[in-house]
Amino acid sequence: MKIYFIVGLLFMAMVAIMAAPVEDEFEPLEHFENEERADRHRRVTCDLLSFKGQVNDSACAANCLSLGKAGGHCEKGVCICRKTSFKDLWDKRFG
C-alpha cells in the first residue's frame, strides 16, 4: 500500500512540474504591437437567439441587465437597452 502512495505522489509531482509555465513562453504574448478594436455585434441577442420567435425580447433584456441597464427590447433585430440603470430604477420604485 505504501508503494502505491509513493508512486502516486511521484506521478503527481511529475505532472505538476511538467505543467508549470516556463517564463520564456510568456514574453512574446506580453508585447502587443498593433491592437485592433473588437467588433460589436448588437444583433446576436435578437437575431440568433430568437429562433422562430421563442426567446424574443427576454434574451435582449437579460443582456441589458448584465450590462447594468434596467432592461431592453428588440427593435428590427437590434437590441435596444434602456437609458436608465437598474440602480436608478430600483431607487425610484423602492427608495
Curated annotation (Swiss-Prot):
**Sites of the modification Phenylalanine amide?**
F94
Is-annotated flag, keyword Acetylation?
Answer: no
Top-level taxon of the source organism: Eukaryota
For this UniProt record, the keywords arranged alphabetically read as follows: Amidation, Antibiotic, Antimicrobial, Cleavage on pair of basic residues, Defensin, Disulfide bond, Immunity, Innate immunity, Secreted, Signal
> Where is this chain's protein located in or outside the cell?
Secreted
Family matches, as PANTHER family: DEFENSIN
Give the record's family classification.
Answer: Belongs to the invertebrate defensin family. Type 1 subfamily.
- Name of the protein: Defensin-1
Organism of provenance: Apis mellifera
